[in-house]
A protein has these predicted regions:
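Flexible beta-alpha connector loops of hexameric P-loop NTPases
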Residues: 76, 120-124, 161-169
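P-loop NTPase motor core
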Residues: 1, 38-101
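Short secondary-structure boundary/capping segments
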Residues: 35, 85-88, 162-169
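The start of beta-strands in P-loop NTPase/AAA+ ATPase cores
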Residues: 14, 65-67, 146-147
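Walker A/P-loop-proximal flanking segment of P-loop NTPase domains
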Residues: 1-38, 46-56
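Conserved P-loop NTPase "ATPase switch" module shared by AAA+ and STAND
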Residues: 142-169
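Asp/Glu-centered strand-loop micro-motifs enriched in Gly/Pro and often flanked by an aromatic residue
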Residues: 1-20, 74-79, 122-126, 130, ...
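Mid-core helix/loop region of P-loop NTP-binding domains shared across ATPases and GTPases
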Residues: 98-149
Length: 170
């Protein structure tokens, strides 16, 4: 089934939130969207992945338009709340660092340097939200646009609320 035709519908709304039961392909859809909208996806990759599909025949104006940050919170949903906080911080920081490398941003752990260069991503190993904030500032300073995808956004909360580690992994 070719579901790429729905990409056009996504572009008509500024924010999307997919709330389907487990095993409905939400993670696959986030990967499709990340690849479709990513500036870093080459024409060859695009043709290989989307060739013959509706979206390849009729691409939208925003294809390849964004710098994409794709966060998957399922990687941080294990262990105690303290363990999950540490894993979530590490995951967000790792993805921000990978984003910086992918799109050619400079990264620094020097707060003074980061404060004077808006195009620099400041890496704070203990404060992923600050790292993420400086990533957003750097993207904006370059005149780029960010497409943020958060997969399994509820996994962390479900584990914390249910106070157990055996939450369905799908």
């Amino acid at each position: 089934v070719d579901n790429t035709k729905y990409i056009r519908e996504f572009e008509e709304t500024p924010f999307q939130c997919f709330t389907r039961p487990p095993r409905w392909g939400k993670s696959l859809l986030t990967q499709i969207l990340a690849t479709y909208y990513d500036k870093a996806t080459t024409s060859e990759q695009y043709g290989t992945l989307f060739g013959g599909l509706d979206i390849h025949k009729n691409p939208t104006k925003l294809r390849g338009h964004f710098q994409v940050l794709n966060l998957d919170f399922s990687k941080a949903a294990t262990g105690s709340v303290e363990d999950m906080n540490a894993l979530l911080t590490e995951h967000i920081n790792d993805e921000c660092l990978a984003f910086g490398g992918k799109y050619g941003y400079n990264i620094s752990t020097d707060m003074i340097e980061a404060a004077t260069d808006p195009e620099l991503i400041y890496h704070d190993e203990n404060d992923a939200m600050f790292t993420l904030k400086t990533l957003g500032t750097a993207v904006h300073a370059r005149g780029e646009e960010l497409y943020l995808i958060v997969d399994e956004y509820d996994r962390y909360a479900n584990v914390c609320l249910l106070d157990r580690e055996d939450v369905d992994q799908d």
